[in-house]
Amino acid sequence: MKKNQRWLVLALLYAGVGAASAQTADVLYVRSLAANCANCHGTNGRTVNDSAVPGLAGMPRDYMVTQMMAFKSGARPATIMHQLAKGYSDAQIEQLATFFAAQKK
């Protein structure tokens, strides 16, 4: 293999690793956001039996976004969720909703 071809192959491999690392970092970031919800809503949004707190696993994405935005704006009354929702950007809320919608109930 010629020297230029080797550099090209190495560059392409490095670019692929970088993209995979970025995807992994994104997944870990969203999982770290979701971990904050586990205190009340259970690991990965699965509540324990007889919990008064709703499970988030499998919740429709658009519904969760709507509810979180309502908490954030104060339109939906809550004991604590309105304060927690204000700590997330709109993009983070959308990421969380996508994450929980993908979880099995």
Give the predicted meaning of each segment.
Residues 27-30, 45-72, 82-86:
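Gly/Gly-Pro-rich "capping" loops immediately C-terminal to redox-active cysteine motifs
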Residues 9-16:
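Bacterial N-terminal signal peptides
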Residues 18-24:
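Sec/Tat signal peptide C-region and signal peptidase I cleavage site
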Residues 15, 30-33:
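Residue-level signal for mature regions of secreted extracellular proteins and peptides
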Residues 67, 76, 85-105:
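C-terminal capping alpha-helices of c-type cytochrome domains
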Residues 35-43, 96:
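The canonical Cys-X-X-Cys-His
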Residues 41-46, 101-102:
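Detector for the c-type heme attachment site
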